[in-house]
Amino acid sequence: MTSAELSDMDALTQVAAIRDGSLSSVEAVEAAIAGAQAVDPALNCIVHERYDRARAEAAAADAAPAAERGPLHGLPVVVKDLDGTLAGEPYWAGSNYLKRLGYVATETSILFQRLIDAGAIIIAKTNTPELGLVPSTEPTSVGPCHNPWDLDRSPGGSSGGSAAAVSAGVVALGHAGDGGGSIRIPASNCGLVGLKPSRDLVPTYPDIDPWGGLVARLGVTRTVADTALLLDVLAGPDNLASPQVRTDRAVSYLASLDGPVGPMRIAWTSAVPGGGTIDPAVAQTVATTAELLADAGHDVVEATPSILTDEAYYGQVIGWFLDAFSVWVRRSVDELEALGGEPVGEGDVEAHTWALRAAGGDVPAHRFAEAVDGLMRVGREGRAFLEKQPYDVLLTPVC
């Protein structure tokens, strides 16, 4: 099995081949490692290698009896160096501070444990901007990640390393997280499927409702079916997680792909928040997609939520976000200090992180509460837009 052959296989195909014995986990992992070693000098998508441990885990997977094999058995994957930790493995979160201290995590997140329990073999951890705060992956701690489609461009962020690895064919599944676009933006930049799941669908423990519940975790893949498979593995409640984690799943997400899809009512718009502009090619792609959906028998109408057209209201929303965001960043830097056991100085974090941390200290409690309530209101208004007509889907450009 070569890395090129592996890159032609989606996750479902790899798992099926490992299950029927036509491919071993060792072969798949070796091919993924070879692929990573071939592309990473140009992409800089890998920040922590687990190659030797992954080889040992793959050998153990091949020796496991059929009764002990999970839905991702033997599958090589990568995980983002943020939005989750692996006990005994380095964790930097894109931060010079944790890198300088050589910090090693002491706990495995529920999300990563579910990957492991399902049989996945984590071969590496991937590049991310410091604390996932910006939509491109260019941390000063390890340097910028590059887009496999064009090395002069960014894969986006904050899950840029995972997106670059999956897009380059190193692995079929890459873990990712999203608060303000960190799954969706890299997926768009790299031509992947990127689903930000509903809030509280995938548990975030040991993080408790990061960013006030705006952060959701899943991954990036090359197919809708692989994303459904990953959601089957990661979604669902846990005794240590938030009590709000949803439990209303009757069937597998993957199995539901084979079910009937009746005509849907779909709203579409090429408007962007605050009255901004988008590239004409992107606008045309959205319009063409709407036409294709109409040709497929769906009821497709052009309709735009007010937040995308009311510039004054959008400005208010941005104000809410900046107030809440700066407080959350201040808390995140405090959490860095708790992990490292040393004060975080101005030179330990990037300039924008330090500035946001300082701004967070100037936001009074009543304004923070107002900001969080305002952001929750935006979510409720989005739901109201869908339910009023009703619409099943809102089709937009990627934020």
Predicted regions: what they are:
Residues 67, 102-104, 152-156, 184, ...:
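Short Gly/Pro-enriched turn/cap motifs at secondary-structure boundaries
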Residues 92-94, 124-125, 211-212, 267-271, ...:
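Short beta-strands and strand-loop turn motifs
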Residues 1-67, 233-399:
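Amidase signature
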Residues 147-159, 200-207, 326-343:
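Short, basic, helix/turn surface patches
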Residues 155-174, 214, 218-221, 336-359:
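Electropositive, surface-exposed helix/loop patches at the edges of structured domains
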Residues 108, 192, 283-287:
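Amphipathic alpha-helical segments in well-structured domains
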